[in-house]
Amino acid sequence: MKREWAPQLLSLVRIVLAYLLIQAGTIKLFGFPAPLPPGVTIPVGSLAWVAGMLEVIGGPLILLGVFTRPVAFILAGEMAVAYFYGHARMGHWLWPVANMGHPAVIFCFLFLYISAAGPGPWSLDARLARRRASTAPVS
């Protein structure tokens, strides 16, 4: 693979990650595209409900590449809380696959990376930066 494709691949990873995050949020809040397991409810105001709201609001922002760095940092924190508060408490805190927390760990570190690396070239953040650079006065 050519190294010059790395920025575009960063954008692609960001877009796919956001697509998955939106689904996680809509399942929590709306039972779509898959219903919650039988007997599972997420009360308004609960930690899971707050997570769903962060995912439904933050997901589209990440997908479009708007306010990418701060939103990705917040979502990395959300996923860390999800892991340590939700999954690690079930036991096997050092083994995320054993407590079904590995998606939260993967999301956490990918969002942390995106918060440092930025959105990539296929984003509204990048488009706005290019526009500002082209209209900046030359000194």
Label each residue range with its predicted role.
Residues 36-46:
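Perimembrane loop-to-helix junctions flanking transmembrane segments
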Residues 1-30, 45-53, 57, 64-139:
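Extended, low-polarity transmembrane helix blocks
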Residues 33:
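Conserved catalytic-core motifs of eukaryotic protein kinase domains, centered on the activation segment
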